[in-house]
A protein has these predicted regions:
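Bacterial N-terminal signal peptides
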Residues: 8-20
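Positively charged n-region of N-terminal signal peptides that target proteins for export
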Residues: 1-4
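Core of compact, soluble alpha-helical bundle domains
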Residues: 26-153
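Signal peptide cleavage region of secreted peptide precursors
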Residues: 22-24
Length: 153
């Protein structure tokens, strides 16, 4: 037992000497603020918002023409692209694999009025899901720069 005591003391002293080098720096321990994606509720919440939003667009007399040429699979594909895009745009882990906005909307003849109607539907959807004003504003700020790539193509 006496032979283990010096070894044990040496081991503890060595550990105490090197332990600070393995400790996480204070900035690594600090929590990152949650992303917009997380604050919105993650993937399932974005999927629910997308379903409601697309439902509104597809039944709006002004906008339903954009969905009339798509079968169920086509609408499902659009839905997935919207979810993936929103996920990525809000800091989520998704990968958007769709076309860039200009290419995807070329030839559709989307007008400023169509854009405005779509934004109103998005706001109504976010309100339906009781998205707080701060997060709603961040979502709208994330999509507003896309207007130039979508309208008038």
């Amino acid at each position: 037992m006496k032979r283990l005591t010096p070894f044990l003391l040496f081991t503890l002293a060595a550990f105490a000497a090197v332990a600070p080098f393995f400790a996480a720096p204070p900035e690594a321990v600090a929590q990152k603020p949650p992303t917009l994606y997380q604050r919105l509720g993650g993937y399932d919440a974005l999927a629910a918002v997308t379903d409601d939003f697309i439902g509104r667009l597809a039944t709006d007399p002004q906008l339903k023409r954009f969905f009339s040429g798509h079968n169920k699979q086509g609408v499902t594909r659009i839905r997935q692209h919207v979810i993936d895009f929103l996920c990525l745009a809000t800091g989520g882990p998704c990968a958007y694999t769709g076309q860039d906005m200009k290419t995807a909307h070329t030839g559709l003849g989307i007008t400023d009025g169509d854009w405005d109607a779509s934004v109103k539907h998005l706001i109504a959807t976010l309100d339906k899901f009781r998205v707080p004003e701060k997060e709603k504003s961040e979502v709208l700020s994330a999509i507003s720069p896309l207007k130039g790539d979508i309208v008038g193509r």
